[in-house]
Swiss-Prot record:
GO cellular component: a single term: nucleus
Name listed for the protein in its UniProt record: Homeodomain-only protein
Organism: Gallus gallus
Source superkingdom: Eukaryota
GO biological process: one example: positive regulation of gap junction assembly
InterPro entries on file: HD, Homeodomain-like_sf, HOPX
């Protein structure tokens, strides 16, 4: 059973990921995720995992549960 090796993003990759998270979209759609993955050189799975972990960190820093649904009117 093959498992994907955990990869720590480089400083340059982190800059791209953080920029997209903070300035573009905290919830990228599949097309955007694919473009970010291509730009960083990471796999789509690695990129998605990073966004999920980063979103949980952001939610915690904002005093929100790390996982919950969207707030809707």
């Amino acid at each position: 059973m093959a498992t994907e090796k955990s990869v720590t993003p480089t400083e340059e990759q982190l800059e791209i990921l953080e920029y997209n998270f903070c300035k573009v979209n905290k919830h990228p759609d599949p097309t955007t995720l694919c473009l970010i993955a291509a730009e960083t050189g990471l796999s789509e799975e690695q990129t998605l995992k990073w966004f999920k972990q980063r979103l949980a960190e952001w939610r915690k820093s904002e005093g929100l549960p790390s996982e919950c649904g969207s707030v809707r009117d």
